[in-house]
């Protein structure tokens, strides 16, 4: 890797000497799935220096150990002499620079996991999730710099939200981009290949859309619909958008995996056929990730920027960051004209019933769910449904709850939009920082002019079910409880190779009491061979207190269990207009 790369890099380093950090990114053999990275460092104190690879990607709250993909780390001085490199921790390398004035660190990154948060390279395209590709100089994340991308010979297009540098290399087809600090670089993905690119402009912000992969999308339709979503979102914040340019990178693949937000871009991963029957889901995803350019990238907990890339960054406010965003990603489709009011109420009802019908909702407060995202939310196990509650859905319901409180408080003249504007102005515009948990509550109380301890004690730090009818009834929505106690087995089943397998056991259920566990194979019930549908039908005909005998296989041992059927009531609600407070109802579900 040294020879030709080193000669070119030393020449380029001289050309960009005004910059303190420069990266060269190559992909000479994409079939091997390796990005070749050079990190050129200048203007540092003589002696040792340390470079580090982040262990996580902001917006995805899991330590992913990106350094596991790094190989062949080498370093050279400005004369081409090799310097000693030693690893000092799982994600750090110390370079013995001595009296060197410039250091060129070279390494390879294996990239063969295509997701919105991990990098990928093959003969069809390259995707760079920057947190897992670019190292930083320890103690100097504030250094500005440039990145030069040298595409594989068959790749014609480079898409990134980074600005082009004023000085470019002379090598054909390469492009150089600039960044003010490492936080901006790591927040800027790259799509490199032959993606289809189009653009549209809304309120003076240019939006570039890069579509990788074939699909049943219609560009003319996307331009119109994505622009309407963007317009609706700008209106939430008084028509103001902090970006002059914004980039969508869309991966159209077999198995779509959601999205990841960045300050002036997003990466979306969707099923390539989603633009048919699942088109509104795609628009909801667009709305969700775009909303993050305000909520989480600028309106944010103080822990979420500037980041510590070496370890977890804990906050108990993800229910606001992701939850409020989830609330808006469907509400905005009403405002943009893609959902009717009735359709939206059915959507909100579904979210409400998912939340309150979850066993884990009575166990894990949403503040704890936020804080434990690193160890529970992103690392679920077979018991997670019994003990955890997603901050996405619970936060969305709490967002709707607060929206109703605000609309009622101000008699249909203000809503959650105005509180979001208030947070943006008070913390991002005036202070340019995030807020603490106490500051968030204080801001809400100041905005509303009332104490909100009950809300945080009961619903954020507690697990109580709110009186939804009382709150939503004031904005014209009746909430009727529809939960009923039924005889329940309490285990979810799947068919695997003809075998009836247990994939979930509800806490406190008849199945759990009998000793049934996830992973058990159910061979027969009351001496009758069954598959999963037959078993569900059989136990569904039993009454409270009646029993059945299960023959199961566990770890290749045969066991017999007796199940005594019990009652279970899953909370459920129905939402429908109640005919009152029509002005507030119409204000809530207004269109642009």
Model feature map: region roles:
Residues 21-23, 35-39, 103-105, 145-147, ...:
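Hydrophobic residues positioned within well-ordered beta-strands of beta-sheet architectures
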Residues 42, 76, 150, 551-553:
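A generic structural motif
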Residues 63-72, 76-229, 235-243, 255:
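Non-catalytic architectural context of zinc metalloproteases
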Residues 320-341:
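Extended catalytic-interface subdomain
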Residues 19-56:
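Early extracytoplasmic/domain-onset interaction patches
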Residues 39, 196-318, 324, 328:
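Juxtacatalytic substrate-recognition/specificity segment
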Residues 329, 339-592:
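C-terminal recognition in membrane/secretory proteostasis and scaffolding
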Residues 1-22:
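Bacterial Sec-dependent N-terminal signal peptides
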């Amino acid at each position: 890797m040294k020879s030709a790369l080193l000669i070119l890099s030393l020449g380029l380093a001289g050309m960009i000497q005004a910059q303190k950090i420069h990266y060269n990114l190559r992909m000479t053999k994409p079939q091997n799935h390796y990005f070749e990275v050079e990190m050129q460092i200048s203007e540092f104190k003589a002696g040792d220096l340390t470079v580090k690879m982040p262990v996580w990607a902001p917006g995805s709250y899991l330590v992913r150990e990106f350094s596991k993909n790094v190989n062949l780390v080498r370093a050279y001085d400005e004369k081409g002499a090799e310097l000693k490199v030693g690893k000092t921790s799982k994600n750090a390398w110390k370079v013995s620079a001595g009296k060197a004035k410039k250091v060129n660190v070279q390494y390879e990154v294996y990239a063969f996991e295509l997701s919105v948060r991990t990098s990928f390279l093959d003969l069809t395209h390259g995707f760079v999730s920057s947190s897992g590709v670019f190292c930083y100089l320890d103690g100097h994340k504030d250094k500005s710099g440039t990145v030069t991308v040298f595409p594989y010979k068959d790749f014609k297009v480079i898409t990134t939200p980074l600005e082009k540098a004023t000085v470019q290399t002379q090598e054909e087809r390469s492009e150089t981009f600039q960044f003010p600090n490492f936080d901006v670089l790591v927040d800027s993905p790259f799509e490199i290949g032959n993606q289809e690119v189009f653009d549209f402009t809304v309120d003076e912000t240019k939006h570039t859309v890069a579509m990788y992969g074939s699909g049943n999308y219609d560009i003319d339709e996307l331009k119109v619909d994505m622009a309407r979503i963007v317009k609706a979102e700008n209106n939430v914040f008084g028509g103001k958008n902090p970006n002059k340019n914004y980039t969508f990178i869309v991966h159209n693949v077999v198995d779509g995996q959601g999205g990841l937000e960045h300050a002036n871009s997003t990466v979306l991963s969707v099923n390539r056929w989603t633009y048919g029957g699942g088109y509104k889901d795609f628009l909801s995803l667009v709305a969700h990730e775009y909303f993050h350019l305000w909520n989480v990238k600028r309106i944010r907990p103080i822990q979420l920027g500037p980041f510590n890339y070496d370890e977890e960054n804990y906050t108990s406010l993800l229910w606001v960051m992701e939850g409020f965003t989830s609330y808006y990603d469907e509400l905005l489709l009403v405002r943009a004209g893609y959902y009717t009011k009735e359709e939206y109420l059915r959507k909100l009802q579904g979210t409400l019933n998912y939340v309150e019908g979850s066993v884990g909702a009575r166990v894990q407060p949403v503040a704890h769910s936020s804080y434990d995202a690193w160890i529970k939310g992103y690392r679920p196990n077979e018991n997670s449904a019994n003990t955890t509650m997603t901050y996405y859905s619970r936060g969305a319901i709490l967002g709707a709850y607060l929206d109703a409180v605000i609309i009622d408080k101000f008699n249909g003249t203000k809503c959650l939009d105005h509180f979001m504007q208030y947070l943006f102005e008070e913390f991002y515009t005036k202070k340019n920082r995030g807020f603490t948990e106490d500051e968030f509550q204080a801001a809400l109380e100041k905005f509303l002019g009332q104490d909100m301890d009950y809300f945080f004690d009961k619903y954020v730090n507690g697990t109580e079910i709110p009186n939804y009818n009382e709150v939503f009834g004031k904005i014209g929505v009746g909430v009727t409880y529809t939960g009923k106690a039924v005889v329940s087995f309490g285990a979810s089943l799947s068919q695997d190779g003809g075998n009836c397998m247990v994939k979930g056991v509800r806490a406190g259920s008849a199945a759990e009491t009998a000793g049934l566990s996830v992973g058990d194979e159910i061979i027969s019930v009351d001496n009758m061979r069954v598959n999963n549908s037959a078993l569900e039908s059989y136990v569904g005909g039993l009454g409270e207190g009646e029993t059945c005998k299960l023959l199961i296989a566990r770890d290749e041992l045969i066991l017999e269990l007796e199940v005594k059927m019990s009652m279970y009531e899953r909370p459920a609600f129905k939402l429908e207009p109640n005919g009152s407070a029509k002005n507030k109802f119409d204000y809530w579900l207004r269109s642009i």
